[in-house]
Amino acid sequence: MEHKDNSKMYGTTILCIRRNNHVIIAGDGQVSLGHTVMKNSAKKVKRLANDTVITGFAGATADAFTLFERLEGKLEKHPGQLLRACVELAKDWRMDRYLRRLEAMMIVADKSVSLVISGNGDVLEPENGIAAIGSGGNYALAAAKALCESNDKFSQNMTLEYIVTTAMNIAAEICIYTNNNIIMEKIED
């Protein structure tokens, strides 16, 4: 995500992997203000809806908290219907003048679906169960895909936690807006 305003606090890399009836969303802990690291231990991954939904954000921190609140409201209105709640949030995001200015993206997941909600109000389900957002998102995504799609016996025995941690650490080595203080939330069936 491009940082348009150096006076806003940004949070960056979020990775979601769904594999073998488990889903993990992980986020790094770095918050940047312009080119300065303001915090190394921010929690950008949260549980919502009585711990049945996990979500992570990248982008302007204050904007992301606004979206968390809106999503919580939609989940209360549509319990157990994550896709519908996200589509309703996206509609509001596209139509509301204030929300359209928010600079954030989210990944949300429950036991059955993972979704990316973009800053344009799009709701996308990743094809292969792997999604990443933020400035280090492409690095984390590439590393996660390589680890998940490898066919040797070693990779088949890797835990989901190992894959997520390794991919996030690779992103942290490459992206200056990402650190290796990784926080994960997991839902298992």
From Swiss-Prot:
Signal sequence bounds: none
A Gene Ontology BP annotation from the UniProt entry: proteolysis involved in protein catabolic process
Active site: T12
Location relative to the cell: Cytoplasm
GO molecular function annotation: metal ion binding; threonine-type endopeptidase activity
Keywords attached to this entry: Allosteric enzyme, Cytoplasm, Hydrolase, Metal-binding, Protease, Sodium, Threonine protease
Catalyzed chemical reaction(s): ATP-dependent cleavage of peptide bonds with broad specificity
Principal place of residence: cytoplasm
Keyword Acetylation assigned: no
GO CC annotations on file: HslUV protease complex; proteasome core complex
Residues where Na(+) binds: A172, C175, T178
Coiled-coil residue spans: none
EC number of the protein: 3.4.25.2
Transmembrane segments: none
Activity regulation (UniProt): Allosterically activated by HslU binding.
Cited InterPro entries: ATP-dep_Prtase_HsIV_su, Ntn_hydrolases_N, Proteasome_sua/b, Proteasome_suB-type
Top-level division of the source organism's lineage: Bacteria
HAMAP family: HslV (MF_00248)
Quaternary structure and partners: A double ring-shaped homohexamer of HslV is capped on each side by a ring-shaped HslU homohexamer. The assembly of the HslU/HslV complex is dependent on binding of ATP.
Function: Protease subunit of a proteasome-like degradation complex believed to be a general protein degrading machinery.
Family named by the database record: Belongs to the peptidase T1B family. HslV subfamily.
Protein name as it appears in the record: ATP-dependent protease subunit HslV
Species assigned in the record: Ehrlichia ruminantium (strain Welgevonden)
Taxonomy of the source species: Bacteria, Pseudomonadati, Pseudomonadota, Alphaproteobacteria, Rickettsiales
Gene: hslV
